[in-house]
């Protein structure tokens, strides 16, 4: 295995560790303020501490974890507030992306439509974490279709997949309905209507997570899906 393959494998494991921790937070098994220890997570998942450390760094950058000298790593107390504050930013960014993507859709139709169909297929499996990844892939395909590098960088910086995992873990909306809620976005893009695409994305994102609150120590998201 060459260096690139080793790096890819480690990155994949780190992403799995990240998703596991996010689910633990979302479902209340790691309440806000709770300590999170590298050795314990590594032992629990049967992996080395290296991918766990990488996952910790990513989640700290997203504001879900915080590390302090002589204290260790904990679930950040303001994680929910940060998520709520990120929603209108994401809504605005994706609205702009929709407007731009509508004019470029003919070049990206296969990717956007393909990711939408893949999301619907994944929904049938009932795995919310897998669905969150598929939903993120769809939204990323729309932002990519905007063909604006600055917009894509800003969108990526929000940690969309983590936001989506948190929302889906705490929501009881059927995944088939969650997938179908993306159809107006696809319809607007296929119609080549910038204003309609902007409205569809802005409304979709703003509606799915208007607020979060404690629920048995976890994160209770609104019932709309990302």
Swiss-Prot record:
Function field: Transcriptional regulator involved in the regulation of the entire oxidative D-xylose degradation pathway via repression of the corresponding genes.
Record PANTHER family: GLUCONATE OPERON TRANSCRIPTIONAL REPRESSOR, TRANSCRIPTIONAL REGULATOR, GNTR FAMILY
Single GO molecular function: DNA-binding transcription factor activity
Family annotation (PROSITE patterns): HTH_GNTR
Keywords: DNA-binding, Plasmid, Repressor, Transcription, Transcription regulation
Keyword DNA-binding: yes
Annotation: DNA-binding region: 38-57
Gene this protein is translated from: gntR
Functional pathway: Carbohydrate metabolism; D-xylose degradation [regulation]
Record-level GO BP terms: D-xylose catabolic process; regulation of D-xylose catabolic process; regulation of DNA-templated transcription
InterPro entries cross-referenced by the UniProt entry: GntR_C, TF_FadR/GntR_C, Tscrpt_reg_HTH_GntR, WH-like_DNA-bd_sf, WH_DNA-bd_sf
Protein induction: Is constitutively expressed at low levels regardless of the presence or absence of D-xylose.
Occurrences of domain HTH gntR-type (ranges): 11-78
Keyword NADP: no
Protein name, as recorded: Probable D-xylose utilization operon transcriptional repressor
Disulphides: none
Pfam families membership: FCD, GntR
